[in-house]
Amino acid sequence: MAYELFYWPTIQGRGEFVRLALEEAGVPYVDVAREPGGMGRMMAAMDGPDHPSFAPPFLKAGELLVGQTANILLFLGQRHGLAPDDEQGRLWVNQIQLTIADLVAEAHDTHHPIATSLYYEDQRPEAKRRAADFIETRIPKFFDWFEGILGRPEPKDYLLGERVTYADLSLFQLVAGLRYAFPQALARIDAGYPLLSALHDRVAQRPRIAAYLASKRRLPFNEEGIFRHYDELDQVAHPGAGHGGG
């Protein structure tokens, strides 16, 4: 059985976190909206009477329909060895994923700080203020936490040690997205987080992920998705920011 992933066809967005898990698991899936007639199918599925999703992404597995990125990953992680078998471990990985989702939402709000219904050009002054605070205070706050997990009780390859989880894949995507959106700022901030940077590189080198990144299935970052690059928002981090935790 091939999974059916429903997400917008031209952006990585939140659907990319699901794609990375499916690719690492090596399971067949169809990116429905990228297929002929797929957008119509996706919109129809969103209007379905049973368990409708508020927005993409959502995943169809047989008769089962699962929405919300972290919820989908919780489901896939248990099925395909991308999460621990015990309840405490599963909840811990889900907790990390939800924290990643918080930072992803804040990254989006740097370019749409007032309203998603407005164009970026309609809120540029506010976006500059939001991005400056995001770079100076918010990224380091979150990165401190991730670095601390990777460093306790001693430095490790992945969040749980030697075993990769969907949260590791999502951290790779988070770092890659922030590097795209804020290359100057991240070049400085990254230096303070060697374990997080190493995890990004380690995930990128995993055979299935490396093959995916080199394929046409991997959509490029662009200015329609969550992580968008605008030169005026890519401000150099404050000298006090970017110190590693742990």
Predicted ranges, named:
Residues 8, 166, 216:
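Short, solvent-exposed turn/loop segments enriched in Gly/Ser/Thr/Pro and often Arg
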Residues 88, 95-205, 244:
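GST-like fold's C-terminal all-alpha helical module
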Residues 194-246:
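Long hydrophobic alpha-helical segments typical of transmembrane helices together
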Residues 4-6, 186-187, 211:
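Short, contiguous strand/loop micro-motifs
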Residues 77, 174-175, 213:
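Active-site-flanking alpha-helical
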